[in-house]
């Protein structure tokens, strides 16, 4: 396999393990362990770690090794702070660029309760993909490439956080469905100011719930 392909393979596999929390936040990694686990040489692994450091997923310290970047309550608050700045702004200023067909599709989906009910972990995990697709649609409609690029970094961290706290998310699932419907109704009515305000409310409620879930996770893992 060509060297560039090996670098891509190493990057993809290590990144997936970090995002899925198989390599947990705060855990220590080293090149020897990674080369053995992936069946690759040091060069592609080292290259992958450099890329992951640029993404904020690992911290590389000379003579101390590699640490998977921790996810703290402060990090979570900062992620939601950025979302609160960007997503309502996009709706208010670029909402008219959103594809009406996709808005209608999402509206129909959020009107239908999950087959397994709101209290199941399976429904919660399925909601992650739906929620991610909905918010990605909004951000991708923004023509400002700098907003899209900076948002991409928090998407990765947000995905990692979701994996970390999946078991506790079911408590907020039903409310999230309702909040998404309210945002979508405003979008379909082309009331972008109202859509932006409902997005602010949704993001703030999500932030409060996320902080609670983080504390639950830390308590559970400390036991």
Q: What residue ranges belong to the model's regions?
A:
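Residue-level recognition of short, well-ordered coil/turn positions
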Residues: 22, 57, 121, 191-192
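Alpha-helix N-cap/N′ positions at the starts of helices
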Residues: 86, 175-178
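Conserved amphipathic alpha-helical segments that form helical-bundle/coiled-coil interaction surfaces
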Residues: 91, 96, 100-165, 177-186, ...
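Mobile beta-alpha loop/short-helix "lid" or hinge segments that flank ligand
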Residues: 58-59, 152-157, 171
